[in-house]
């Protein structure tokens, strides 16, 4: 079973969301998602300042197996991207919940977070796959 930190929220598309002290949210893909994709070779990051709606594809993770869209779990403005992934996309594999984060977003409607899964619900989703 994949590592599913309890303090995070999850989308059904295997993104995770973590609230930061400054009120922004950090987004990445789950350990389960990176295991399915395999070794990352490139991450196409969103543009800082871009406005996205929940469910929009806003980044792409390319691995040796496939390219996979990364979706915004909430609506808002992209306020930062993980530039370290340009040189080290493998951080998504080795540190999916830390150094392998993809982007940070300032949520425009925090009520959307209520529709995301908690760790227990995400684990149940994984068991059903």
Curated annotation (Swiss-Prot):
It comes from the Bacteria. GO terms for cellular component: cytosol; glycine cleavage complex. The modification N6-lipoyllysine is found at residue 65. Signal peptide: none annotated. InterPro entries: 2-oxoA_DH_lipoyl-BS, Biotin_lipoyl, GCV_H, GCV_H/Fam206, GCV_H_sub, Single_hybrid_motif. GO terms for biological process: glycine decarboxylation via glycine cleavage system. Binds 1 lipoyl cofactor covalently. Belongs to the GcvH family. This is Glycine cleavage system H protein. It comes from Citrobacter koseri (strain ATCC BAA-895 / CDC 4225-83 / SGSC4696). The lineage of its organism: Bacteria, Pseudomonadati, Pseudomonadota, Gammaproteobacteria, Enterobacterales. The gene is gcvH.
């Amino acid at each position: 079973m994949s590592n599913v930190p309890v303090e995070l929220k999850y989308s059904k598309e295997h993104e995770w969301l973590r609230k930061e002290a400054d009120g922004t949210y950090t987004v990445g893909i789950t350990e389960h998602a990176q295991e399915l994709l395999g070794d990352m070779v490139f991450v196409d990051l969103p543009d800082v300042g871009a406005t996205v709606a929940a469910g929009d594809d806003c980044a792409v993770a390319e691995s040796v197996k496939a390219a996979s869209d990364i979706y915004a779990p909430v609506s808002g403005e992209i306020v930062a991207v993980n530039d370290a992934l340009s040189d080290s996309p493998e951080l998504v594999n080795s540190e999916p919940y830390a150094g392998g984060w993809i982007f940070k977003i300032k949520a425009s409607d925090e009520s959307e977070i209520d529709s995301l899964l908690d760790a227990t619900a995400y684990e149940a989703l994984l068991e059903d796959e």
